[in-house]
Regions:
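Short acidic/glycine-rich loops and adjacent helix/strand connectors
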Residues: 2-290
């Protein structure tokens, strides 16, 4: 009986925080690790060179043994709206086309610089690279790893290629996205803006703000102010009032405008780091210390 060939997929995430690599065999994840676990460079954005090596060593395979490589971002979409005024930012997305292949060539046995000849030969051939739309990758990660055969899917983050929120349906082995919200309306940017306003690093320290939100503090007054800056829309999604947010204006040093700061009559209404630390200590003492 002829044994069917297994399907080996190398998954990659890089260019954003927490560069990661993983291996799936016949649709089941068998290995995965963030780059920071190996290099101790916390939340690194560098290409996950060491993570890829770890995963390949774990299954005792070479890169050439993989059937394909998947990257959770499709940089081709960013070429559609190229803006030369902000080329430093725009080309970052497009460069995925080159950085993935360029970095992975280090794993293939070759005699530099004969990369083109190697690519054309049957031996030591680079596996095909698939660039998956970012929010579709999020949806697949949620649905295909769930126990459901059919489910409604909602994905939200700062941004994908242009999408910030997606609504869809997953059924069996297919996902259909039927509604999206695009920049500048973004829940991720909304949360990052308040993270920065509180004195933390946007795109990095949101988890700290999320943890602090669980503290037993009356935030009713702040909640009413926040609701002035974000509105629900008739399609079940939302819109940000752009007079408060400027995260998509790339030459501005802050994500928020003066109008958002002035929404708070006193700047002291925004908890200082000292106040937050005291809240943390009190929460720990009251709930965990004995």
């Amino acid at each position: 009986i002829k044994q069917l060939k297994v399907l080996i997929v190398l998954g990659l995430n890089h260019g954003e925080i927490n560069s990661t690599a993983s291996i799936s065999i016949d649709g089941k994840i068998v290995c995965g690790t963030p780059e920071e676990r190996i290099t101790r460079n916390k939340k690194t954005k560098l290409f996950p060179q060491n993570a890829v090596k770890f995963c390949l060593d774990f299954i005792d395979k070479k890169l050439e043994d993989c059937d394909c490589i998947a990257q959770g971002w499709n940089p081709g979409e960013n070429w559609q709206k190229y803006n030369p005024l902000f080329s430093t930012y725009r080309t970052k997305r497009e460069d995925y086309f080159y950085t993935v292949a360029d970095n992975l060539y280090n794993f293939v046995d070759r005699s530099p610089p004969e990369w083109v000849l190697m690519q054309q030969s049957e031996k030591n051939k680079m596996p095909p690279i698939y660039f998956v739309r970012h929010h579709l990758a999020h949806a697949a990660n949620a649905f295909f790893l769930s126990p459901f055969k059919e489910a409604a899917i909602l994905t939200c983050d700062w941004r994908g290629e242009f999408q910030t929120t997606s609504l869809g349906i997953g059924k069996e082995n297919k996902i259909e996205i039927f509604s999206t919200k695009e920049l500048p309306h973004s829940l991720g940017m909304f949360y990052a803006t308040y993270t920065q306003l509180l004195g933390y690093r946007d795109g990095y320290d949101e988890w700290k703000v999320m943890a602090l939100s669980a503290f037993d503090v009356d935030c009713t007054e702040h909640l009413e102010k926040i609701r002035k800056t974000i509105k629900l829309t008739s399609d079940g999604l939302f819109e940000l009032d752009q007079s408060y947010y400027q995260g998509v204006i790339l030459d501005k040093p802050k994500l928020y405008t003066d109008k958002l700061v002035n929404l708070y009559t006193k700047l002291t209404e925004i908890p200082s780091k000292t106040t937050i630390i005291k809240l943390q200590l009190n929460f720990f003492i009251n709930n965990f210390a004995s």
